[in-house]
Amino acid sequence: MAVELGLGVFSGEWHPGTGLDHSETLRESIAQVVHAERAGLHSVWVSEHHFHPANFVGSVAPYAAAMVQATERIVVGLGLALAPLHDPIRMAEDAAFLDVLSGGRFQLGLGIGYRDVEYEGFGGTRKQRVRRTVELIEICRQAWGEGTVEYDGRIYQRHGIDVTPKPVQPGGPPIMMGGHHPDAIDRCARLGDRFCMDAGTDSESYEGGDGRNRGLLERVESAVRIYREALARHGRDTGAPHFSLNVGGFLHPDGRDAAWAALAEAYMMTRRVYGDWYGLAPEEYADWYPDRMTPEQIEQRKGELLLGTPDDLFPVLSQVRDLVGENLVIMFRSKYPLVDDALTRQSIDLLGELRTRLRA
């Protein structure tokens, strides 16, 4: 597989400032997925979150099914579903159904999550999140194979269950696992098919660092090295690791400043949401609004994103391609609430041009 460029993440969130109701917003997002397919993008990705005033859609399987039904070629993936919140048999059935409906175009991305309110809302706790994820994957693998599920875990016990229909893809849809800690990378090397790195998260910046992300290329190189080492420990192929990079940004024909102008309000709203989720005190993100930020603060925020034209973005993404190799999927987050539909579609078209250049 050559390097690929996909579009993410679709969370289905709704904001009244758009002038649309939530139904119209969801239909608009499905139309953008169709537009992404026409632009030649490889994939679209749906993420899962619950219980927040930003109106995130937690029902990721139906959302993905709507995208599958509206398209013919593009890969539709969960990037990422929160594994500890799901019953493993239900997840196995939903993933198999999506794979059958799509004709084998579905990929299952899984994360362990980090928000206590989400675990508690589904009757779980943070301390069980890793074990629940491991057992869910093991049960799904059994369920997608021949015969019945026979599983005795610390959390789940399932016996005599024959999940049907079986997936189209032999062995089931590929499982992508996210995270940024070496333990998460090792877990993916042992259980998954592809590792997903979030370009917006740098574990070293929180562990004795200064709170700022290291350079993107440095972090990609480090993650690929750690992933290869983990694959080797588990006796798996290390030659061309299956690696995804989730990176935020926006494209505009007039360059970086125009891209930021289109995205600034929406991006800073997203940063405030994540500031809350990461446990910051409200006063710490009270001034995270473009009109309250200094020029220096704005430049710092721009540096968290890939902004500009295809010519602007090609150099750094081609270096990422060269670091990772041929099994790279770049999950480019260019879908944000509050951004005008026409500007989003324009960014998608430019992503299509960028994909062509990266694959040349």
Annotated model-derived regions:
Residues 1-360:
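Active-site-adjacent structural elements that line small-molecule/cofactor binding pockets in enzymes
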